[in-house]
């Protein structure tokens, strides 16, 4: 319902939000809006948490992914396996250690790019409250009380 499609709009979900953010930063072409859906936001997590995630992934990828998919689901979710793309260890490492930069967000605003962030209060993947607090000074934040990571 909120995803907009257009020539001057960049959007991304979860890890894809990091990719969309970097694309908007690096783009020489016109960008009017950046939409971030449940952006991967782990910069408030400690190093131990991140190391454990990577260790569990390396030890048993299938069990890690099964647990991850279970955490994605909420009451309204049907099957999500068809939409899931397995990532690599390197991608998980990038996702966990990515730092959203206030300076980069300010740069996007200076370029005239409107930023929208969509978060679910019941998200079991990221700390959506921390993400809301971080993004609210740079973006219009939509915080859905009854939604999880999949919104």
Label every model-predicted segment.
Residues 1-8:
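Conserved acidic catalytic loop of the alpha/beta-hydrolase fold
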Residues 12-20:
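Gly/Ala-rich beta-loop-alpha elbow adjacent to hydrolase catalytic centers
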Residues 25-59, 90-100, 104:
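Flexible "cap/lid" loop of the alpha/beta hydrolase fold
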Residues 52-56, 66-78, 94-95:
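Helix-loop "lid/cap" segments that line or gate small-molecule binding pockets
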Residues 111, 116-119, 123:
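Short beta-strand/loop motif that positions the catalytic acidic residue
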Residues 113, 127-138:
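Short alpha-helix in the alpha/beta-hydrolase fold that links the catalytic acid
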Residues 124-125, 141-151:
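Catalytic histidine-centered segment of alpha/beta-hydrolase-like enzymes
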């Amino acid at each position: 319902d909120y995803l907009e499609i257009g020539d001057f709009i960049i959007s991304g979900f979860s890890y894809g939000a990091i990719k969309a953010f970097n694309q908007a930063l690096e783009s020489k072409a016109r960008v009017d809006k950046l939409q971030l859906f449940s952006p991967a936001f782990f910069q408030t997590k400690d190093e131990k948490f991140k190391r454990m995630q990577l260790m569990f992934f390396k030890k048993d990828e299938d069990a890690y992914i099964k647990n991850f998919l279970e955490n994605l689901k909420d009451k309204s979710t049907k099957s999500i396996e068809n939409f899931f793309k397995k990532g690599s260890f390197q991608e998980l490492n990038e996702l966990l250690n990515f730092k959203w930069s206030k300076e980069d967000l300010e740069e996007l605003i200076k370029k005239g790019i409107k930023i929208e962030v969509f978060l679910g209060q019941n998200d079991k993947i990221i700390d959506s409250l921390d993400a809301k607090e971080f993004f609210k000074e740079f973006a219009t934040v939509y915080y859905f009380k009854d939604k999880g990571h999949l919104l």
